[in-house]
C-alpha cells in the first residue's frame, strides 16, 4: 500500500468518525501501522504544532473505539498504534527522515481530512491514550561554531554523547525509556545554559539487543558521529562487546543499563562508571527475602535465566547469595530461554518434572519472556512467587501482565535500583517535572528514571570539570565525587577503587491494579 493510498484510506475513516469501521479491526490495525509513524515523526518536530497532532490522534482513537467493541481488541489496536508512533519517532531520531519530510507527510494527512492549522484553536487537550504516545522535544541542533577544544565530540557549542541500545526488537522499550530519561536531564541542563555554554546532545544507535550488531553501532557513534563518550548503553551481552571497544578507545562508558560484573572489574576499569547496584546485589536481596521473610527452603527456589551473559550474571548472584547464607549452591535449578524470544515451554516442562515443589522463581529475563512464563505457569503452580531484577522493564512487565488480567500481575516482585516513580522524593519530583516539561504525555517509568539519575550524576561531574574538558580530566573529577546528594535517600560516591555510585536496592510488588507498591525486603 502506498503512502498516499494509506493517507486516503485513513482519512476516509477519520473523517467519518469511524462509522463504517465497526468491527473491521484488521483494516484499522493496518492503518494504525501507517498513520502512527506519521504522527510519531511529527511529534519530534518543533515546527509542527501540538494541537494539530492531537486532533488526528483523537480522531484515530475514535476509530479504534468504533472498530473494536471488545476491550481486548481495543487494547491490541491501541498498542499497535502506540508502537507505530514510537517507530515514527525513531525514524526522526536516527536521521532517516528530516522534519521537512515529516511536515510534508503530516500536511498531506491533514489536507485529506480537510484540516488546517488555522482552524485548530480550542481543540481538545491530550487524552489519556494519546498521552502514552510520545515525546515532543526535538533533537538539539548540530553545533556550527569552530571548536576551541581538541577533545573529540566537544565544540564551543555542544558536547556529544552516544547511546547504543535496543531501539528495535522485543526489548526496544528499554532502549527508548533509557534514552528518554537521559534526554530529559540533558534538556533540563541545556535550558539552564548548558555546561560552560555547551549544550549536551545524545545520539542513538540501534543494536536490537544483539551483540553481533553492537560493535558496528559503537563504531558508528565513535568514528562517524565523533561522540565524546557513551552513556546509558543497554544490556549485558551487548556490553561484553561495547566495553572492550570503549576501553580500547579510552572513551568514557557511563551509567549503562546493566548490573553485570563485566562492568565491575576489581580494580575498576578507568573509563567505566556505573550508577546502579549490581545484579548480584539485587538477587542477594531477593534470596534473603524469600528465605528469611517468606520462610522458603533453598531447594524450593528456582531461577529462570536468559541464556546469555545477562542470565549468567543473575544466576551467579543467586548462587553467591546462597553461599553467603551458608547454603550449597550446587543444587539450584536453572531454567532458561533464548534471548529475544518468549520460548519458555522447555523451562516449564523442566519445572513440571521436579520432585521437590518449587515455590518461587527468581527471573533474570526481559519483560515479554517474564510475562509469558507467568502466563503459562500461574495456573499450573498456584501460589508460585515470581521475582524479577530491575532490567526486566517494570512498567512494560506490569502492562503485559495486566493485559492478561489482574490475577497474573498481583504479587509479582521486582527489585529496583531507583526509588518508586510514584513517590515524592526530591529526585523523583525533579525527574517527573523534567519529564512532563520536555516529553508531555510520557508516563514516569523506572527505566527512564534510571537514565535521568545517571545523566544527572554525569552532569554534576561535567560542571566541576570546567571549560577545558577532556576525558581524563572528567574521569579524575568522577573519581573524586563524594557524598553527592540527589535526593535518592542515600548519597552517591565514586573513588579510584569504587566506580559504582549506588548499592541501594528498593523492593516493589505489582498490585491488582497494575501499580507498583513498596515491599520491605528485610
Describe every region a protein language model picked out:
Residues 126-131, 437-449, 459-515:
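Segments of small-molecule ligand-sensing domains
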Residues 147-155, 162-181, 205-211, 234-235, ...:
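Extracytoplasmic "Venus flytrap"
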Amino acid at each position: 500500500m502506498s503512502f498516499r493510498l494509506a493517507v486516503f484510506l485513513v482519512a476516509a475513516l477519520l473523517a467519518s468518525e469511524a462509522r463504517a469501521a465497526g468491527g473491521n479491526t484488521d483494516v484499522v490495525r493496518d492503518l494504525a501501522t501507517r498513520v502512527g509513524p506519521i504522527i510519531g515523526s511529527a511529534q519530534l518536530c518543533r515546527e509542527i504544532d501540538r494541537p494539530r497532532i492531537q486532533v488526528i490522534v483523537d480522531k484515530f482513537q475514535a476509530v479504534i473505539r468504533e472498530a473494536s467493541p471488545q476491550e481486548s481488541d481495543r487494547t491490541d489496536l491501541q498498542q499497535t498504534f502506540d508502537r507505530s508512533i514510537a517507530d515514527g519517532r525513531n525514524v526522526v531520531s536516527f536521521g532517516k527522515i528530516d522534519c521537512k519530510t515529516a511536515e510534508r507527510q503530516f500536511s498531506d494527512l491533514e489536507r485529506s481530512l480537510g484540516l488546517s492549522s488555522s482552524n485548530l484553536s480550542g481543540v481538545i487537550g491530550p487524552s489519556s491514550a494519546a498521552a502514552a504516545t510520545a515525546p515532543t522535544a526535538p533533537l538539539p541542533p548540530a553545533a556550527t561554531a569552530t571548536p576551541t577544544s581538541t577533545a573529540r565530540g566537544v565544540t564551543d557549542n555542544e558536547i556529544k554523547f552516544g547511546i547504543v541500545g535496543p531501539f528495535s526488537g522485543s526489548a526496544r522499550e528499554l532502549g527508548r525509556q533509557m534514552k528518554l530519561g537521559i534526554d530529559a536531564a540533558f534538556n533540563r541542563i541545556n535550558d539552564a545554559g548548558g555546561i560552560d555554554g555547551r549544550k549536551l546532545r545524545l545520539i542513538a544507535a540501534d543494536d536490537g539487543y544483539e551483540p553481533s550488531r553492537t560493535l558496528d553501532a559503537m563504531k558508528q557513534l565513535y568514528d562517524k558521529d565523533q561522540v565524546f563518550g557513551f552513556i546509558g548503553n543497554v544490556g549485558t551481552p551487548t556490553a561484553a562487546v561495547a566495553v572492550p571497544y570503549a576501553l580500547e578507545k579510552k572513551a568514557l562508558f557511563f551509567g549503562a543499563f546493566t548490573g553485570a560484573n563485566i562492568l565491575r572489574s576489581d580494580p575498576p576499569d578507568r573509563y567505566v562508571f556505573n550508577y546502579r547496584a549490581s545484579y548480584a546485589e539485587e538477587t542477594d536481596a531477593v534470596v534473603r527475602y524469600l528465605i528469611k521473610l517468606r520462610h522458603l527452603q533453598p531447594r524450593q527456589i528456582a531461577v529462570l535465566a536468559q541464556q546469555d551473559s545477562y542470565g549468567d550474571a543473575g544466576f551467579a548472584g543467586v548462587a553467591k547469595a546462597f553461599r553467603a547464607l551458608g547454603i550449597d549452591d550446587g543444587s539450584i535449578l536453572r531454567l532458561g530461554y533464548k534471548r529475544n524470544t518468549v520460548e519458555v515451554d522447555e523451562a516449564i516442562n523442566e519445572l513440571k518434572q521436579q520432585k521437590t515443589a518449587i515455590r518461587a522463581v527468581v527471573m533474570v529475563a526481559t519483560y515479554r519472556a517474564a510475562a509469558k512464563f507467568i502466563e503459562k505457569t500461574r495456573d499450573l503452580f498456584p501460589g508460585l512467587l515470581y521475582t524479577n531484577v530491575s532490567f526486566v522493564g517494570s512498567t512494560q512487565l506490569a502492562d503485559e501482565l495486566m493485559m492478561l488480567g489482574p490475577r497474573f500481575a498481583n504479587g509479582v516482585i521486582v527489585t529496583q535500583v531507583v526509588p518508586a516513580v510514584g513517590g515524592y522524593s526530591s529526585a523523583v519530583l525533579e525527574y517527573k517535572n523534567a519529564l512532563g516539561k520536555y516529553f508531555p504525555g510520557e508516563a514516569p517509568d523506572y527505566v527512564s528514571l534510571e537514565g535521568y539519575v545517571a545523566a544527572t550524576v554525569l552532569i554534576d561531574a561535567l560542571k566541576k570539570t570546567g571549560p577545558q574538558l577532556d576525558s581524563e580530566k572528567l574521569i579524575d573529577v568522577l573519581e573524586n565525587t563524594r557524598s553527592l546528594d540527589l535526593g535518592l535517600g542515600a548519597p552517591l560516591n565514586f573513588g579510584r577503587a569504587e566506580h559504582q555510585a549506588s548499592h541501594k536496592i528498593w523492593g516493589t510488588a505489582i498490585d491488582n491494579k497494575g501499580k507498583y507498591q513498596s515491599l520491605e525486603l528485610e
